[in-house]
């Protein structure tokens, strides 16, 4: 074949193009990584999540697409468990190759998606607003907020700026708990969940750590709680919710004696109490799917209802254990949420 014949052979030229072009037969197009940024390096979740990202094997899990590229330390000086840990976790991430930046805005310039991992729920609203404004999908670690008004303000901000977000405790997606949401053919009549329930004075009592057990309770029961009553003492907490269909769900918070996580579920033809915590990997898998454009694994409205359950329990405990309606609690908090959001938006506009 002469040089002129080789150049002029359409079939040959086409075969060479197919053999070498990206995405050609035999060569799948490379899936670009999702550049992730973390806001808040004062919790063990940060280094645990980062380790799962690093160890994920391409082709086996969507987590392998996540690449932690930047982080903003944040931190809260008035919470010792935040202030005392932030330097260590920041160093650990920096040493692993993560760029540490000095502002949320600097982080947003470098990433495709965000994890708000700040330990302090009071900081989440201010941190989430610029993330929503930048159009980045966002996972907000527990607790969503310190109280219901802030949680509602997060949702209002997301609606205003069309932000995509979800929040969850890792307990929700542990397989022996998540199965109750996956298999909707089993009739659940009630559930009893428990978890450690340490207190933090800047948060509603059940928001700080009781959120884990309440999230497990809601995974089994689903949304639709109407009233909550709470009994409280130094060593324990018991909150009883009545759902709109008459079912009853119970959360027991443990502060004294042996502590652990658990869930008993009472069904029409079964009683099961074999739920157990199985680590962060199931949650991180859900985060990866969501940040990659997948469906939202927990409806925002359900997360807001969980915060309303917590606030109603707070009110009930202060008033001697009277029943407190979630819809009334939500209505009062909404007024405060609108005020708080406007304050934050005004601050942002002046910067």
Task: Give a label for each model feature.
Residues 28-29, 114-115, 292-351:
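C-terminal helix-rich "cap/oligomerization" subdomain common to oxidoreductases
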Residues 144-203:
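A contiguous active-site-proximal alpha/beta segment in oxidoreductase catalytic domains
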Residues 1-11:
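N-terminal export leaders
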Residues 135-137, 142-143:
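Short helix/strand-capping hinge loops at secondary-structure junctions
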């Amino acid at each position: 074949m002469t040089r002129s014949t080789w150049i002029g052979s359409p079939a040959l030229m086409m075969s060479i193009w197919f053999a070498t072009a990206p995405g050609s037969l035999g060569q799948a197009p490379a899936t670009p990584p999702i550049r992730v940024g973390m806001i808040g390096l004062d919790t063990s979740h940060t280094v645990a999540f980062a380790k799962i990202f690093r160890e994920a094997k391409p082709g086996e899990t969507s987590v392998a697409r996540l690449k932690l590229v930047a982080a903003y330390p944040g931190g809260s000086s008035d919470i010792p468990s935040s202030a005392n840990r932030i330097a260590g976790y920041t160093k650990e991430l920096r040493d692993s190759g993560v760029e540490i930046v000095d502002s949320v805005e600097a982080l947003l310039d470098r990433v495709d998606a965000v994890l708000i991992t700040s330990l302090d729920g009071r900081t989440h609203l201010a941190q989430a607003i610029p993330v929503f404004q930048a159009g980045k999908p966002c996972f907000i670690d527990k607790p969503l907020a310190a109280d219901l008004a802030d949680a509602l303000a997060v949702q209002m901000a997301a609606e205003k700026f069309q932000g995509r977000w979800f929040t969850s405790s890792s307990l929700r997606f542990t397989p022996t708990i998540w199965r109750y949401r996956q298999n909707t053919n089993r009739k659940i009549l009630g559930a009893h969940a428990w978890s450690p329930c340490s207190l933090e004075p800047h948060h509603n009592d059940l928001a700080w750590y009781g959120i884990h057990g309440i999230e497990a309770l809601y995974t089994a029961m689903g949304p639709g709680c109407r009233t909550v009553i709470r009994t409280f003492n130094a060593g324990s907490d018991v909150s009883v919710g009545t759902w709109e269909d008459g079912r009853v769900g119970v959360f027991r918070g443990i502060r004294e004696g042996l502590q652990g996580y658990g869930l008993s579920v009472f069904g029409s033809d079964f009683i099961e109490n074999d739920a157990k915590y199985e680590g962060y990997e199931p949650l991180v898998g859900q985060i990866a799917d969501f940040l990659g454009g997948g469906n939202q694994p927990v409806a925002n409205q359900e997360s807001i209802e969980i915060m309303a359950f917590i606030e109603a329990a707070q009110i009930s405990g202060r008033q001697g254990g009277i029943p407190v309606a979630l819809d009334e609690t939500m209505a009062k908090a909404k007024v405060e949420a609108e005020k708080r959001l406007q304050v934050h938006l005004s601050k942002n506009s002046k910067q």
